[in-house]
A protein has these predicted regions:
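Structural motif marking the loop-to-transmembrane transition
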Residues: 100, 104, 140, 144, ...
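Juxtamembrane "helix exit" motif at the C-terminal ends of alpha-helical transmembrane segments
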Residues: 120-124, 153-178, 256-278, 287, ...
């Protein structure tokens, strides 16, 4: 017979009252990063031949034709900066500068660069949670890890804006035969897609942390406008400009959604999976055509294409918000970082 014995366990150590807030702040930073990754296309200005940029977590990334710079506001109020040379794809491979093709290539490069910028800003924000000996050290994400994150982001985009609308439109067609025609089916599919996009943009704008990202987005636009107007880059000068810019990624995404409706009508395929495969196959083509439209509209404000990009400009009322002077200062610093590298690239003066 086994004798009974009392099992004594040591009392657990009391949890410090500081641990819970630190864990929550760290989790909040990770959630901000994940949300910003999904917003990447809406925050970018993916024009290869002009100055553009992207809002990041508590900062701004700016790019010139041959360089990019990023400035992030640290928790202590100072600004952390970083800059690197940037290779223009169309100079190395001339075919990448062809119309439509250049849009796909430039947007792909913008996604990779945008993700790197977001990682940098997230590292700066998370620096306060690291051990003292590791603070200030930046770890570059490996190529495969970055590829996995970008694949996840693209997969999320395809699932939310391609798969879900197609499922919903198919169910409506089965329930109501009036939606069975080629035109009506794709209109319904497009309306659902745009509705999901608007709901996602509006929903994220309710989160105060992402709203600050939208303020930095506004600071980026104002700074680009001031630069293009050859105005001295000071906070008072920059603040005089608009937060709505025609080359914004928000306008690009809305243009993509509108063009999708018209393009899908031209391909009367049958069967759910055939339609889904068609949407995936046409995505690069539609992105390239939309890029050319945004590019043309930015140069010809009174054209029909400019009119088609108006919905995206209206949507910038959500994705860009009025920045304060400290946020504008970040955007100016980022652009100055990029332009300093631009001037000395390869030891020659590129832009005076």
């Amino acid at each position: 017979m086994l004798s009974r014995a009392t099992l004594y366990l040591p009392s657990p150590e009391p949890i410090s009252a500081e641990v819970h807030p630190i864990v929550m702040r760290s989790l909040r930073q990770h959630l901000k990063f994940l949300a910003a990754v999904q917003l990447l296309p809406a925050l970018e200005s993916g024009e290869e031949t002009l100055v553009g940029g992207q809002a990041v977590l508590e900062g701004v990334m700016m790019r010139s034709p041959h360089a990019w710079g990023i400035s992030v506001r640290k928790p202590d109020g100072t600004i952390s900066t970083h800059s690197e040379p940037l290779e223009r794809l169309s100079e190395k491979h001339p075919w990448m500068g062809w119309p439509v093709v250049r849009g796909v290539m430039t947007l792909g490069q913008a996604m990779v660069l945008g993700f790197r910028a977001l990682r940098y800003s997230a590292d700066v924000a998370m620096d306060q949670f690291k051990p003292a000996e590791e603070q200030g050290k930046k770890k570059e994400m490996s190529g495969w890890a970055m590829a996995l994150n970008i694949i996840f982001s693209v997969g999320f985009f395809i699932a939310l804006y391609k798969f879900v609308p197609l499922v919903a439109a198919t169910k409506l067609k089965n329930a109501y035969p009036v939606f069975g025609s080629q035109v009506m089916f794709n209109v319904v599919d497009g309306v659902i897609r745009i509705g999901l996009f608007l709901a996602f943009i509006w929903g994220t704008s309710l989160w105060p942390d992402i709203r600050r990202v939208y303020q930095y987005h506004g600071a980026e636009h104002k700074t680009v406008f001031a630069f293009e107007s050859h105005d001295p880059l000071t906070p008072p000068n920059v603040q005089a400009y608009s937060t709505y810019h025609p080359r914004c990624g928000t306008s690009f995404l809305m243009t993509v959604m509108l063009i999708c409706i018209a393009v899908y009508m031209l391909f009367p395929v049958h069967g759910f999976w055939a339609k889904f495969a068609l949407r995936i196959a046409l995505l690069p083509v539609i992105a390239g055509v939309s890029y050319e439209m945004i590019r043309f509209a930015a140069k010809h404000g009174s054209s029909l294409f400019a009119l088609m990009t108006k919905p995206g400009m209206w949507l910038q009322r959500i994705t860009t918000q009025p920045p304060d002077d400290s946020q504008v200062e970040c955007a100016i610093t980022a652009l100055n970082q990029a332009m300093e590298l631009e001037k000395v690239r390869g030891g020659e003066l590129v832009i005076a």
